[in-house]
Amino acid sequence: QTNLGLAYLDRIRGERADNLELAITAFNLSLEVYTPDSFPYEWARPQNNLGTAYSNRIRGERADNLELAIVAYNLSLEVLTRDAFPYEWARIQNNLGNAYSQRIRGERAENLELAIVAYNQSLEVYTRDAFPYEWANTQNNLGTAYSNRIRGERAENLELAIVACNLSLEVLTRDAFPYEWAREQNNLGAAYIDRIQGDIVENIETAIFCYQEALKIRTFDAFPLDWATTQNNLGNAYSERIRGNKAENIENAIVCYQEALQIYTRQAFPRDWAETQYNLANTLRERFKLLGKVTDIQQAINSYKQAREIIEKTEDKTLYFNYSYQLGKALFEGGYYTEAIEHLENCQQLYQKQKDISSLAPILLELARLYHRTGRLEQARLYFKDSLRLFRRLGDQDNVASVTTALGNLEIQIGKISQACSHLKEAQTYYQENNDKERLEEINHLLKILQSA
C-alpha cells in the first residue's frame, strides 16, 4: 500500500486531485497494518509520505490539509530520529519547514521561525559535499523563508535570502537542473525587488533580469503555472521600475499581468487570480493618471471589485480591507464620490476597532479629500485634523506636510486665515529642508492668496 501510495503521489496521468486522494487512501490503509509498536520504521515512512500528500492536496480546506501534514511529519520524526536515520530525518525536517512556511493557522511570524529552524536542522545533515542536490534545494527553501520573514531586521533577512539563493545556484545550474535553476532565478528576483540595501534602481533591474532568465525555462507550454507566477512577479517589477520610459514600463507590467491571467483563472486558482487582478488594477490606475483614459479607471474599479469578492471568502480580513481601501481610492480618482466614501468609511470603522493607526491615518486623509471635493468643508476639516494628529503620532513628516498643505488650502476657503497661515508655514519649512521645489511652488502660491485675503 505504501508503494502504491508513492506511485499515485508521483503519477503524471489522470487528474492530480484524484491521484492525491488515492495516495492518501493507500498510505492510510498501510497505517492500519503498520503500527508504531509492531513496525516502527514501516509506520514512520508512510507518515512522512502522508505529510507530503496532505501538503500538496488540492481537495479539502488548505488550512486543514497543512495541519494534517504537520501532524504526520512530527509523528514520523518520533521514529526517524537524527541518530538512527539521519538522511530521512533531514528530509522530513525540510518537508516540515515547507509545511510551516505555507501554514495558514497560527501566527505567521512564528510559523516562519519554525520553518527556518527546520531548514537549518536539515542542513546539519544535508551538507554540500555529502548531499549537494538536497543541500541546494534546502538552501532555496531557506531563502524563501528569509524573504518572507517577519521577525528580525527586514534588510538583514533579505540579504540572508539572497545569500541562500546564490548558494543554491552554485549547484542548481541551468545545464544540470534547468527547472530548479529557473525556480531559483524567480526567488532571487523576489528578494531583489524587496531589497533594502544597495541601490534601489539596480535592485529592480536585477530583479527584472532574474525573472526574464527564469522565463527562458518557465515557458507557457512546459510549466504553465510557474510561467504565470513569474509573469505576475515580472509585472510587479515593471510597475516599480525607475529606469526607462514610465509609460513603457506600465505597458510591460499590464502585458505581464494579462499573460498571468491566462493561467490564473477565477475557477482554477481563485486566490492567485484575485491577487493578479489587484496588481493589474493598481497598474491601470497608474496608466489612467498618465493618459487619462476613462476605460482604464473603470477597468481598475471592476478588477478591484472582483478581486475583493474572492478575498472576502478567505480569513484574511486585513487583505480584504486593503483591497477595499484601494477600491475606494480608485472610485475617488474616477469621480464616483458617493461610492468611494461608502467604501472608505467601512475601512475606517475596521481600523478604528483594531486601533491600527498606520492604516487609519491614510484612510482619514482620503476621506478628508473626498469631503473637500464634494463641498462638505467642515467635515473635511475635521478629517484633515484627525489624520494630521495620527501622522504626527506616527512621525510621518512627509504626510504631515501633505496634510498641512491640504488643510491650509481648505482653511483659506472657509476664512480661517491665521490657522491656514500656520499650517502652510509648517509645510513650507519641511519642503524647504527637503528641497522639494514642486511642493514649495504650490505652498508659495497659497501664501500669496493668503496675503491678498
How should each PLM-predicted stretch be described?
Residues 2-10, 41-56, 87-102, 133-148, ...:
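Conserved alpha-helical positions within TPR/SEL1-like repeat arrays
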